[in-house]
């Protein structure tokens, strides 16, 4: 879909079929904010704007792919896994007491926090622009559309059969969208509740 949109706007110089090329061209043509609003699925990435000398960290809408970042001893570190940060010579892992408290209360450490001091996690649906003065601009490109009226019992006026058809259509469309890939696609079904639905 994004490739088609870019083609309609005149871009037709594709070198391959990768998602990475599509992401780069979309950002180059539309700018990062407009481009990521069109991205769906699970992703996190970091991109350097060589013209403006700006670094952007981006995380998918639901936060499925993590992305950690922070300044440690005059070095800016980022990674999709905390264990990779521990490999850097500048990083000495120190537990953040506030994050530990959140973990004990919630059994997880919610973004923007991480378990380590001076390391943050990009929030879902967020772009973080890293500035030269070591500050960050956070740009929310997507937020969960919560409509209170749609959550009330009286607002649902479909029959069971209509709801079944709607759900089947939604699941079919979502699965079809996820099947588009530049590599072979497979699925592992465990037999659990989520695989059986």
Predicted regions and their residues:
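Cysteine-centered catalytic environments shared across enzyme families
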Residues: 1-197
